[in-house]
Amino acid sequence: MTLSAYLALALILFCIGLYGALTKRNTVIVLICIELMLNAVNINFVAFAKYGAHPSVHGHVFALFAIAVAAAEAAVGLAALIAFYRSRKTVQVDEANSLKH
């Protein structure tokens, strides 16, 4: 595959994730879409590390670091989601403003 194929794949994944994050009301789906967007960025890191002007391992290492951070973010997000569900019995994004009161 060429660099443009990887970039096109990453663009498609990012757009799908962005669309889902902006239009869906279920918090679980929004978290999944955010993870999809992060994976699209990781594809860009690896593609530029392989096909860039100076190919190196730095892009791969940064992608691994981003995956670790995304895993921690997903764990914190799901923990917050469980706490929200226990208090409000819903996982809809529209109900999240009720946490203020």
UniProtKB/Swiss-Prot annotation:
A biological-process GO annotation: ATP synthesis coupled electron transport
Disulfide links within the chain: none
UniProt keyword Transmembrane helix, yes or no: yes
InterPro entries documented for this protein: NADH_UbQ_OxRdtase_chain4L/K, NUOK/Mnh_C1-like
Keywords: Cell membrane, Membrane, NAD, Quinone, Translocase, Transmembrane, Transmembrane helix, Transport
Catalyzed reaction equations: a quinone + NADH + 5 H(+)(in) = a quinol + NAD(+) + 4 H(+)(out)
Transmembrane segments: 2-22, 28-48, 62-82
Entry keyword annotation includes S-adenosyl-L-methionine: no
GO CC terms, sorted: NADH dehydrogenase complex; plasma membrane
Main location: membrane
UniProt topology in membrane: Multi-pass membrane protein
Superkingdom assignment: Bacteria
HAMAP family for this protein: NDH1_NuoK (MF_01456)
Stated name of the protein: NADH-quinone oxidoreductase subunit K
Organism, as annotated: Geobacillus kaustophilus (strain HTA426)
High-level lineage: Bacteria, Bacillati, Bacillota, Bacilli, Bacillales
Gene name per UniProt: nuoK
